[in-house]
From Swiss-Prot:
Known catalytic reactions: a (3R)-hydroxyacyl-[ACP] = a (2E)-enoyl-[ACP] + H2O
Residues of the active site: 62
Cited InterPro entries: FabA_FabZ (IPR013114), FabZ (IPR010084), HotDog_dom_sf (IPR029069)
The encoding gene: fabZ
Gene3D superfamilies to which the protein is assigned, alphabetical: Hotdog Thioesterase
Protein name according to UniProt: 3-hydroxyacyl-[acyl-carrier-protein] dehydratase FabZ
Source organism: Novosphingobium aromaticivorans (strain ATCC 700278 / DSM 12444 / CCUG 56034 / CIP 105152 / NBRC 16084 / F199)
Keywords for this protein: Cytoplasm, Lipid A biosynthesis, Lipid biosynthesis, Lipid metabolism, Lyase
UniProt keyword annotation of Repeat present: no
């Protein structure tokens, strides 16, 4: 693991800031929804964080007077965290490969996400087969689950 990838100990990567997230993902503002990685265990799990600010563009219309982060964007944030997990675990950084999501299953929205919170993004690999990976994700604010989802992704050329 290089210094640029963050501090690594026994397959755990720490100190992974937004610059490193941007090196792993093709997403950019306003659709980059992972601000940092708190921890990543190669081939297992990731805990990423999204700081939800009132300045997010989606709050202008969802909903005026009662801003709530759209559920599909919570799923997208989890998918991006899974993308970072896959890129790091499978050694895809700089390879020209992208993580494309193919299926979303069992999505459940439990609690609203309002401005001013840190949204914790917890994603685990549930299955890996050559170019297809399955994940289970949970978004949380503190100990409250806001969203749960299972999804499938494919590794493909960009």
């Amino acid at each position: 693991m290089s210094e640029e990838q963050g501090a690594a100990t026994d397959g755990v990567i720490l100190d992974y800031d937004v610059r490193k997230v941007m090196a792993a993902l093709p997403h950019r503002y306003p659709l980059l929804l992972v601000d940092r990685v708190a921890s990543l265990t190669l081939n297992e799990r990731i805990h990423a964080v999204k700081a939800v600010s009132m300045n997010e563009q989606f709050f202008q219309g969802h909903f005026p007077g009662r801003p709530i982060m759209p559920g599909v964007l919570q799923i997208e944030a989890l998918a991006q965290a899974a993308g970072v997990l896959a890129v790091e675990s499978l050694g895809l950084a700089g390879s020209g490969k992208l993580v494309y999501f193919m299926a979303i299953e069992d999505a459940k929205f439990r609690n609203p996400v309002e401005p001013g919170v840190l949204l914790d993004l917890h994603v685990e690999f549930t299955q890996k087969r050559s170019r297809v990976c399955k994940f289970s994700g949970k978004a949380m604010i503190g100990d409250k689950v806001t969203c749960e989802v299972n999804f499938t992704a494919m590794i493909a050329d960009s």
